[in-house]
Each structure stands twice: as structure tokens, then as C-alpha cells.
Amino acid sequence: MKKIFLILTLISLTLLSCGSDEDSLQKIDQLFNLYIKDSSGNDLLKPTEIGSYTGVSFTDQLAEKDNVNVSYNRKMLADSTYYLEYLAGATRQFVEETSDGGKIYKSEIRVSLTKKISDTQNAPVVQDKLEIFYRSSPNVFEVSRVLYNNQLVFTKVPDQPNVATIIK
């Protein structure tokens, strides 16, 4: 009887020590949405419309091999506005440690845009640079800021979506 009690006590203690609380989980916030519009506010990501960027590709500039494609999704809102949704996939390079013990990483992506100028012709491909900086701490891994062609287009605001609009 003592052996059974001892075994049950050990099993109970083992199970209790393996439990974790919600506070120990790291929040992941790395979804980034990119809108591209002209100076009048017109959507330039409509996939079939003349004057829009009908061809888009993302290429990882920090990958060990050349021309490594990075996946993204072209999505549409209820009002028919298109945007590019990027979740992950590009190489993350360590940049620095922060004063609070966190770490900063970055991904560098070449964004190739092909504009449809007529039913049968496309303009030359435009190649832009997208840099996404991430902040990592024990509590959170999140997009902290984004540069597009070396211009700051996004800075993280707590509990807000990661969204930037580029004017071309």
C-alpha cells in the first residue's frame, strides 16, 4: 500500500512540475501586409488590370543560394483592394542585441514588379528592396519596423496589425 501511495505521489508531482502557465508562451506577430497604390490612392495590385502590377515575385536576398523565391499571398479585401500578405520564409539575419536583452533580426527581400501597360505589353520589371526587422524577446517575436527602398514605411504599434502602404 505504501508503495502504491509513493508511486502515485511521484507521478502526481511529475505531472504538476511539467505543467506550464499562459505567461510563459511567446507571442508570435510576424504577419505583414503590403499595399501598393498610386498617388491618387488607386490600387496597383489588381492582377489583370492595365496599369497595375500584374506580376509580383519575392526573392530572398540573404539566402545562401541565389534566386531563392519567398512565398507570399496576393489577397483581396471585401472592397476589392488587393494586398500582399507575407508571413515567413525569408532568411533572418542577426543584427544586434538590445539593451533589454532582446535580439533584432532582419530579412531582406527583392520585390520584382511587372506592370501591365496594354493587353499585350508589360513595362520593364521594377526591382525594389523590402527589409523587415524583427524584435525577439522571451515574451514576443514581432515585426518591429519595415523599410521599402531604404525608406521607413512601418513601425510597430502594440496590438495593431503590421500594415504598410507604398505609393508608386
Task: Describe the function of each predicted region.
Residues 52-116:
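Tryptophan-paired
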Residues 36-49:
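Short amphipathic, basic-aromatic surface patches that mediate peripheral association
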Residues 119-168:
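Glycine-rich, aromatic-bearing surface loops/beta-hairpins
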Residues 24-38:
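A short, Gly/Thr-enriched small/hydrophobic beta-strand-prone motif that recurs across taxa
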Residues 1-4:
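Positively charged n-region of N-terminal signal peptides that target proteins for export
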Residues 28-29, 47-56:
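Short coil-to-beta strand junction motifs in C2/discoidin
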Residues 19-22:
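Bacterial signal peptide processing site
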Residues 14-17:
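C-terminal motif of bacterial Sec signal peptides marking the signal peptidase cleavage site
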